[in-house]
Amino acid sequence: MKALYLGHAAVLLQTGERNILIDPFINENPSCPIKVQDLPKIHYILVTHGHGDHLGDTVEIAKRDSSTVITNFELSSLISRHGISTHPMHIGGRYTFEFGSVKLTPALHGSSISEGDTPVYAGNPCGFLIEIHDKKIYHAGDTGLTKDMELLRRENIDLAFLPIGGNFVMDLWDAVEAVKMIYPEIVVPIHYNTWEVIKSDPAIFQKEVEKLGLKCRALKPGESIEL
């Protein structure tokens, strides 16, 4: 299985049989090296919350590829009005799909979509714990540091994607504390340097993670990691 980092919080998981895209902020993402038209067929889209830099191009991709969108119940209800297939879930719920299982994990953040100038409530933000071919991937979504992360240690996570940009999410120092609680085999920092307000240094984060005896890969957009 390959995990391709597309910048900001967008990650494409390729199993060989299915392509699973997380938080598809593609066309308007200044750090993404491709456009939606360059993506392979996407079978499933996982959306952590409704903000534009995560919901992104979900509807366009789902319409193009007849993808199933996995997200929280409220956001699922809102975007299903566009005629796309959705699978609603909620925090703590786990479901087995044809590619593997998905569990929604807590995230400390907000979630809304914009209708004109008005933000519309879009359910609880979440992270995803994904199990494919006996490998476990955790995508934290947008979140601050939370003690709930201690519960993830028992999952023996192979690959964790953690935000480090600060301001809207935890900074790199809080992300290091998250690593101590989760203790994944490999960590990849996300959600940083897309804009000045979330500027962070992944080299410092990597150094601190490696002090814990763990692996950190600060992937550049367009780079991938094999599991």
From Swiss-Prot:
UniProt keywords (A-Z) are: Hydrolase
Extract the GO molecular function terms from the UniProt entry: hydrolase activity
The domain of life is Bacteria
Disulfide links within the chain: none
User: InterPro entries, alphabetically?
Assistant: Metallo-B-lactamas, RibonucZ/Hydroxyglut_hydro, UPF0173, UPF0173_UPF0282_UlaG_hydrolase
Query: Which is an annotated Pfam family here?
Result: Lactamase_B_2
* Family, similarity comment: Belongs to the UPF0173 family.
- Name-wise, this protein is UPF0173 metal-dependent hydrolase Tlet_1100
Q: Which organism is it from?
A: Pseudothermotoga lettingae (strain ATCC BAA-301 / DSM 14385 / NBRC 107922 / TMO) (Thermotoga lettingae)
